[in-house]
């Protein structure tokens, strides 16, 4: 079996770069002391940043205990993320080529697709460990980096038009190991928690459980959304193991490749006057009748009259519905 922690492979994966724009965004958020959610989103936008943050957070004495980026961000000192981003290698997608481009961007895009679909699957399955699932999904293909570092022709040897399961079988035949197992070895070498390592290692097992099952479903959905073949029977089977019934799985498939949202005709007539729109904008800001009256130089009774007309014209019953309706139609 290949040793993913040996010389060439280990160092190459350790130096895997973040997209320049991802790195710049993290630095900007960290330097202005963004809140935890903003920092988590900035880190999770890139697998290289995710690896770097988790490795840093899982050093002694916390080794093996930090399961997610959110936990890591809460654990690390305020200036740590800025220092980490400054030290992280980057690549410019349109700039000079290095050994990872364009493979690095393909890896990042697939990782983020699986990450977001894993969060959606976790939500549908009613799971409460979404942060850990998102982290496992972001890192699920780490072993592919090790294989690509050791075997430059890796992508050409493994048929791109095969299903995920067929590609894993080819890896085992060509290299004696699959990328899931190699990824688990790498994750353990960085002192990541055992549950996270197992999810990375086992997402291509015949019968994955727990987080690995959620990642496996998300991985197949991401391949399907990208136009790659998958085994539908395998998707249904692993969906069951992830506690995702057929209706829930069908709903996610319906949303692919991206969640749908209503698009309103910009020419659709707004039934409100400009004064009434000013009032709705004030409602959106959380202002009450007296505040709106003072701001617009009107009496409170006039504001109440305007509100009655606004509700009637929009067909709503209260201020919250008025703000929602006007926002959805793009009138604000």
Question: Where on the chain are the PLM-derived regions?
Answer:
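Alpha-helical residues within the helix-turn-helix
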Residues: 41, 135, 294, 312, ...
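Regulatory hinge/linker segments at domain boundaries
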Residues: 260-281
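Conserved alpha-helical "signature site"
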Residues: 1-154, 167-229, 331
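Short, structured interface segments
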Residues: 244-263
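Hydrophobic residues on short alpha-helical segments
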Residues: 277-281, 311, 323
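Recognition helix of helix-turn-helix DNA-binding domains
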Residues: 286-321
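Basic, Lys/Arg-enriched C-terminal extension of HTH/homeodomain DNA-binding domains
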Residues: 266-267, 312-332
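Short, locally clustered residues in the helix-turn-helix/winged-helix DNA-binding domain
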Residues: 89, 204-205, 281-285, 327
């Amino acid at each position: 079996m290949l040793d993913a922690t040996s010389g060439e492979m280990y160092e190459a994966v350790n130096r895997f770069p973040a997209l320049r724009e991802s790195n710049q965004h993290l630095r900007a958020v960290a330097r202005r002391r963004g809140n935890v959610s903003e920092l988590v989103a900035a880190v999770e936008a890139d697998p290289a940043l995710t690896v770097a943050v988790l490795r840093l957070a899982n050093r002694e004495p916390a080794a093996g205990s930090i399961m997610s980026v959110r936990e890591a961000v809460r654990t690390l000192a305020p200036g740590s993320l800025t220092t980490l981003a400054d030290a992280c290698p980057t690549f410019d997608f349109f700039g000079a080529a290095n050994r990872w481009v364009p493979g690095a961007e393909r890896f990042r895009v697939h990782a983020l697709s699986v990450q977001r679909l894993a969060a959606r699957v976790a939500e549908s399955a009613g799971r409460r460990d979404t942060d850990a699932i998102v982290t496992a999904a972001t890192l699920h293909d780490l072993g592919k980096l090790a294989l690509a570092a050791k075997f430059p022709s890796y992508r050409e040897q493994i048929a791109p038009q095969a299903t995920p399961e067929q590609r894993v079988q080819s890896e085992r035949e060509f290299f004696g190991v699959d990328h899931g197992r190699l990824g688990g070895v790498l994750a353990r070498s960085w002192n990541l928690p055992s549950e996270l390592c197992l999810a990375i290692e086992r997402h291509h097992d015949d019968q994955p459980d727990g987080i690995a099952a959620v990642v496996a479903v998300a991985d197949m959905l991401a391949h399907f959304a990208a136009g790659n073949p998958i085994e539908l029977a395998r998707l249904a089977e692993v969906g069951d193991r992830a506690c995702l019934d057929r209706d829930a799985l069908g709903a996610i498939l319906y949303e692919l490749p991206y969640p749908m949202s209503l698009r309103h005709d910009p020419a659709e007539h707004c039934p409100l006057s400009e004064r009434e729109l000013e009032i709705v904008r004030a409602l959106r800001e959380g202002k009450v009748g007296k505040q709106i009256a003072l701001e617009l130089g009107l009496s409170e009774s006039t504001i109440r009259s305007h509100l009655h007309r606004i509700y009637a014209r929009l067909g709503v019953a209260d201020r919250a519905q008025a703000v929602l309706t006007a926002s959805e139609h793009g009138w604000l």
